[in-house]
Structure formats: C-alpha cells, structure tokens
C-alpha cells in the first residue's frame, strides 16, 4: 500500500510566544485599518483636486496653469506617500498573520493556500524579523 506523502508541520510555539504573536497581529491589523482610513481620506482630497482641475480646464484655463491652480503636485505627492504607507502596513500585517499561523502549527503550504500566495513567499516572510516599533 503506497504511503501518503507527509506534510511537514511547523513545531508549535510556546503559548507565551503565540500570545505575543497574536498581540502583534492585532496591532498590525489595527495599524493597517488606520492607514486605510487615511488613504480613503487622501483619495477623497485627490478626487476634489481632480474635479477642480477638470472644471478649470472646462472653463478654458490653459493646461499649464491648471496643475498649479489645483495644487496637483502637492496632492499627488501626498497620495503617493499614503499609498506607500498602506503597502507597508499591509506587508507588516500579513507577515504577523503568517508568523502567528506558523506558531499555531500551520504549515507554510496551508498558510499559502489560505492567503492565495506562494509557499515560498510565506516561508520568506515568516523568517523576516519583525521591526521594532519606534517609541514616540
């Protein structure tokens, strides 16, 4: 009778470590939620800027004046910065989730299937050090 391929289980972490990883996961998800709120607010601001630019163009203003009058450069820079922020928050939250799942005993393959990513990505992110939060 052919044997079933064995799935390598990650060794379960201590309950203290799992608790710390759970706290980190919750914190990073909260940070991501906050970044998403800031992103939504910035996108609303950007929408207002674009609407103003469109109206200025519609009113016959020269294109070379519209960007300056609508403060497009400032809005673009702020939007780019907030998108980078939400991408970083997403990465930290995902890494925390992967580490928690691994500590709870899930395999890299199980985690990858659940998130729709490659096992290699999960493995790499689980090995990444968690960045220490800056104290303010």
Where do the protein language model's features map onto the residues?
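Short, Lys/Arg-enriched N-terminal segment that forms or immediately precedes the first helix
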Residues: 73-87
